[in-house]
């Protein structure tokens, strides 16, 4: 093989949701990229629940899409049941979710990966990193060594190992090494990384048993059909992209279920001390739910199809690591599951993760230059959180090679910015999940405007191709054109438009009113106004109509939030030099110095969000930084 086969700009380790987005982002910027995976057949595999999106998560998927990523496009091609969550609430918290066909999703991701220029895929497990130990400068990564001894060289490496680092599966008293069920763990790589100056701990996650859907009684369950009209996930998508649609179903556990679980808790690795890692707070096992909510007589279970051409279903809500005989008993005690056949047991998996406070906002490690971490190894849970980190890490890995400054969005620019800032500032002791409640400026960070927030930035950095840019530009132009058209129309009590509005909508126009002001009325929407003959039919693009309505209806709130952001940003981006000596700042307490030394914030905004940081300490820091700046100028 030629020397060029072993040399790349960026190497990505792992072909999951973080790894594929990292490799694609790197390659889109022009960096020669190698994606290493232990099994090409599992690139893009959905290891746990067959779904994309949800509260907070759908926002991340839209942001990935706005930056040219793959997840939303694959979801549109694989989504077999679609819902808009919080549809009756404000636009800030509305979220798109789809039930996905596992095989269709994996196929879509693999096709996107294989079609991407500058991206090479190679099947190999990685056992070690090649790291140059600096003397006068920091250590830096130079490449990787595979299980078979192949050495691939690159000045940037992105590690996206998911649950594979020293992964250990638990089913009752049985435990064994695995990355996930059916896949070997990355044991050697985990051991090598533990020799490096990284803070490493253990987390755990779990998955429910899978069931043969043909053995269930759907007659005692509640059907949950998808939405009509169907939403789409990608700004490039259309409803015709979706495959055939199916329903999900809802059932409940019973008192018998809970009794079976309580009687077997002594055999649960969660309660015997066998599992040391902390699990996700917002996706607890059925054992946890029965113990923590002892007063509840039932827990809801969503019966979700795994795909169109397979019989398996995913019983969302009964993640468990109890012994198999207990799993079988508890499953058959659920309404409609009396004759259920389990096709795969549920299990818990423990794995290594790195304290994310050891990362820069670019997701580059502070300890080793050119080495980036993304996904579950940073303490997060969920496909969407992993994919968003992967895109950011892949982009910055490429920019590192290209000699360009790293990029990371602020908290007021993207949920991705909230995610990264939370991780690198606060760290985490349990798997981190994104919610809209984590964002201070969520009215700005809506699903519908993710492209308006990020596509221009993505285009400037090489992430957005010509087709997406043309679609985005056309959409923005249409929004502006329609807003301008409506702003030129006025209704008065006596003119024709005023009479039409009153007649068609039953709305009284008591004074001269601009049509845009009519949209601001709580009882009116863009769609209802378009029923007025002089105003309609309006635009036929639902995304354009939505943008027009939201930008007008919430204009006052948005303006106030922008003012809040401007005030907050006054010192947010003031940089703190790398290697800054906090002991040199007179007046800082030892406690504050230790907090700052531990996190090593890159700017004042990050320093402000360190738990226990006081306004007085920030003021002292700002004064010191300003003095240092003036002395350099002088």
From Swiss-Prot:
It comes from the Bacteria. FAD binds at residues 14-19. GO terms for molecular function: flavin adenine dinucleotide binding. The keyword Flavoprotein applies. Its main location: cytoplasm. NAD(+) binds at residues 279-293. SMART domains: GIDA_assoc_3. Coiled coil: none annotated. Its cofactor is FAD. One of its GO terms (cellular component) is cytosol. It is found in: Cytoplasm. NAD-binding protein involved in the addition of a carboxymethylaminomethyl (cmnm) group at the wobble position (U34) of certain tRNAs, forming tRNA-cmnm(5)s(2)U34. Homodimer. Heterotetramer of two MnmE and two MnmG subunits. NCBIfam families: mnmG_gidA. This is tRNA uridine 5-carboxymethylaminomethyl modification enzyme MnmG.
